[in-house]
């Protein structure tokens, strides 16, 4: 099952995350199927490629809870 989740990068105590499509059994920093954005929790900077995210969600990809909250906050997902 494919998941829309965060992949950590950055230095120690300075996290930055990429928003990626991965198999649910892949380790956190494994090879993604596709990269669809990034999020920096320190500066609150984020970028989400709306076209790619909508495309993957239409294919049935499930976002994790954290990613779901980020997408909801940026008005990409409506409930």
UniProtKB/Swiss-Prot annotation:
One of its GO terms (molecular function) is structural constituent of ribosome. Its main location: plastid. Pfam families: Ribosomal_S16. GO terms for biological process: translation. Keywords: Chloroplast, Plastid, Ribonucleoprotein, Ribosomal protein. It is found in: Plastid, Chloroplast. GO terms for cellular component: chloroplast; small ribosomal subunit. It comes from the Eukaryota. InterPro entries: Ribosomal_bS16 (IPR000307), Ribosomal_bS16_CS (IPR020592), Ribosomal_bS16_dom_sf (IPR023803). Belongs to the bacterial ribosomal protein bS16 family. This is Small ribosomal subunit protein bS16c. It comes from Thalassiosira pseudonana (Marine diatom).
């Amino acid at each position: 099952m494919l998941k829309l989740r965060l992949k950590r990068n950055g230095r120690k105590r300075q996290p930055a995350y990429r928003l990626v499509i991965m198999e649910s059994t892949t380790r956190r920093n494994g090879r993604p199927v596709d990269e669809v954005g990034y999020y920096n929790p320190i500066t609150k900077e984020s970028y989400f490629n709306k076209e790619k995210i909508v495309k993957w969600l239409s294919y049935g990809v499930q976002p994790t809870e954290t990613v779901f909250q980020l997408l909801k906050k940026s008005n990409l997902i409506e409930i």
